[in-house]
Amino acid sequence: MKRVVYPGTFDPITNGHIDLVQRASKLFDSVVIAVAASNRKGPLFTLEERVSLAQKALSHLSNIEVCGFDCLLKDLVEEKQAYGVVRGLRAVSDFEYEFQLANMNRALAPSMESLFLTPAEHLSYISSSLVKEIASLGGDVSKFVPKLVQSALTDKYNELKA
């Protein structure tokens, strides 16, 4: 069985992430969506909230698992008995960073493969950072995230303003 891990902060999960998971789920028997704690990044949502949002947003897919993690990615890939990781490349600017990560992961775990998927063109400009910025200023993010994520963003920013 070919299983891959799709790691990310998913703060929050976007339609771009969901598109990548849907396509990966057709290519592999199983996809583990690994939500990184990423405390250094200072995420808006807690790890538990991000895991929950991802689980709900991806509940229509039967061959996926969502989990949080706070360890080396190579250790999670080993634990999940995965073939490697899948990552999205939105633009050339993503490539340099992802190439560096892939090489570092290969140095740490020589058998771990890094696979890259490009997004659907109409989703290529979406990023969690931009979505959060738009939402924080009261903008409409309905084209970029599922309704449940849009509601969670509204609630979170209202909570922060209170």
UniProtKB/Swiss-Prot annotation:
Binding site for ATP: T9, F10, H17, G88, L89, R90, E98, L123, S124, Y125, I126, S127, S128, S129
GO molecular function: ATP binding; pantetheine-phosphate adenylyltransferase activity
Pathway participation: Cofactor biosynthesis; coenzyme A biosynthesis; CoA from (R)-pantothenate: step 4/5
EC number(s) stated in the UniProt entry for this protein: 2.7.7.3
Presence of keyword ATP-binding: yes
Protein's job: Reversibly transfers an adenylyl group from ATP to 4'-phosphopantetheine, yielding dephospho-CoA (dPCoA) and pyrophosphate.
NCBIfam families: coaD_prev_kdtB, cyt_tran_rel
Full protein name: Phosphopantetheine adenylyltransferase
Gene (UniProt): coaD
